[in-house]
């Protein structure tokens, strides 16, 4: 999957920094408007951020760009093809089940919200025709309960719609071959399964820093500890990656982070 780039020297390994050296760099750091967010967060001017073509290819592009820095050439197409080859029937069925579940839930929520809105309007009309105070209280209580249920479902529907968005590429996908095909296409955006699987098959480890958390001043969650979503790695119980790749996650985009480039 990787081809050596002739004529491009492989950079030497960086000298390991001691805790004292890292502390000295932080103490000497002076923030500048031109500094990127990682430099500001780490208080270290040696970090760079490399943009890529974006879209659904961004995570694959960070791998391509990272290995290009050590004179190893690959492509997004090759990486997607390699990932597609890891798909099993169980993996396909899991994605299919998730898509079907959220799709059905969205339809159900939409219908229930519509019905509750109708029920509320009927109770409102009924309330306006009632003269008896006690009966008014009963209808008012019913109307409040219906509205509360309606508002609750509206919020749940928003969450369901967001979850369904993550599986939208599964629309019209009915078998494993179709699923493999969509993974080879930019409609599939890398998720936790893709990240864990790419880490295993390429023997790499992503260090994910969240610029979204940094911008929201949620500094405790800048370093994202991704979940392990690969049964083969789980069964091995041990993982010793050959390379570590630092990436910036913006919330919907990945970019490569470099150090002392």
Q: For each predicted feature, which ranges?
A:
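Non-catalytic, low-structured ubiquitin/UBL-interacting segments
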Residues: 1-52, 68-73, 93-159, 258-261
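Alpha-helical interaction elements in eukaryotic regulators
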Residues: 34, 54-55, 59, 75, ...
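Alpha-helical recognition domains of nuclear gene-regulatory proteins
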Residues: 41, 61-62, 66, 82, ...
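Interface signal in eukaryotic adaptor modules for cytoskeleton, membrane trafficking
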Residues: 59, 64, 71-105, 166-168
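C-terminal regulatory/interaction module of P-loop NTP-utilizing enzymes
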Residues: 158-171
């Amino acid at each position: 999957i990787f081809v050596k780039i002739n004529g491009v020297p492989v950079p030497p390994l960086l000298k390991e920094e001691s805790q004292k050296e890292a502390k000295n760099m932080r103490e000497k750091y002076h923030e500048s408007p031109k500094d990127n967010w990682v430099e500001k967060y780490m208080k270290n001017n040696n970090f760079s951020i490399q943009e890529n073509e974006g879209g659904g290819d961004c995570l694959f592009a960070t791998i391509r760009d990272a290995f290009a820095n050590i004179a190893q050439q690959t492509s997004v197409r090759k990486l997607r093809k390699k990932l597609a080859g890891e798909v099993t029937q169980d993996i396909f069925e899991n994605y299919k089940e998730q898509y079907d579940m959220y799709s059905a839930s969205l339809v159900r929520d939409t219908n229930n919200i519509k019905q509750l809105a109708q029920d509320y309007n009927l109770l409102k009309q009924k309330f306006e025709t009632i003269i008896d105070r006690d009966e008014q209280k009963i209808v008012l209580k019913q109307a409040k309960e219906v509205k509360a249920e309606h508002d609750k479902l509206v919020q749940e529907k928003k969450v369901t719609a967001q979850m369904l968005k993550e599986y939208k590429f599964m629309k019209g996908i009915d078998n494993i071959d179709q699923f493999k095909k969509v993974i080879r296409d930019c409609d599939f955006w890398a998720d936790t399964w893709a990240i864990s699987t790419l880490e295993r098959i390429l023997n790499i480890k992503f260090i994910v820093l969240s610029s979204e958390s940094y911008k929201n001043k949620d500094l405790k969650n800048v370093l994202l500890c991704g979940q392990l979503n690969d049964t083969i790695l789980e069964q091995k119980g041990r993982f010793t990656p050959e390379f570590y790749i630092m990436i910036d996650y913006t919330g919907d985009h990945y970019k490569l982070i470099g150090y002392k480039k």
